[in-house]
Amino acid sequence: WPRKTALLVLMAVFTIGNLACALAPNYWTLMAARVLTAFAHGTFFGVGSVVATSLVASDKKASAIAIMFTGLTVATILGVPFGTWLGQHFGWRATFWAVTLVGVVAFAIIALLVPASKDAPEAFNLREDLAVLKRGPVLAGLLTTVLGWVGVFAVFTYLAPLLTKVTGFSD
C-alpha cells in the first residue's frame, strides 16, 4: 500500500477499535478491541516514522521523528489524566468515546495534510522480512523493547491508586 493509505487504514482500525471499546457489551469484547487498537497503534507509529522522514530533507529526519513522537508523549502526559477524569465523572466508556473522536479528527488531518507518496510502494517478501527474527540479537532487542513498554504501561495502571492512597492526593 502507499504510505498515506497505510496511515489512513491504521488510523481507521485504531478508531474503530476504540469505538468497539466504547460499545463493548462484555469484558472479552473490550479486551479483543484493545488488542486490535494496540496492533494498529504500534504499526501506525512505525509507518508514521517512515512517512515523517520521507517528507523532510536528510538533515531534518531525526527532528521529524522527534516531532512525531512528541505527539505520543503529549498524548500520554495529558491524555492519561484527562481520560481518568472523564472515566471518573462520566463512566469508563466516555474515555473511549473521546479517543474515538480524536481518532476521527486525526484521520481527517492525515487525509487532508499528508501528501500522497510520489514513489511506488516498495515490494516486500514477508518470509524474508520475518527471517530477521531468527537472529538472536534482533529477537533479544525486540523482546527487551516489548518488556520495557509493558513495564511503562503497567505503571500507568497503578499510578492513580499510588497517588491517591499512598501520597494522599485527592481524586
Where are the language model's segments positioned?
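Conserved MFS/SLC helix-loop-helix module at the cytosolic interface between two early adjacent transmembrane helices
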Residues: 1-25
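Helix-loop-helix hairpin linking two adjacent transmembrane segments in secondary transporters
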Residues: 25-29, 58-60, 67-112, 158, ...
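Juxtamembrane intracellular "pre-TM" segments in multi-pass secondary transporters
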Residues: 114-144
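Extracytoplasmic gate region of multi-pass secondary transporters
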Residues: 139-171
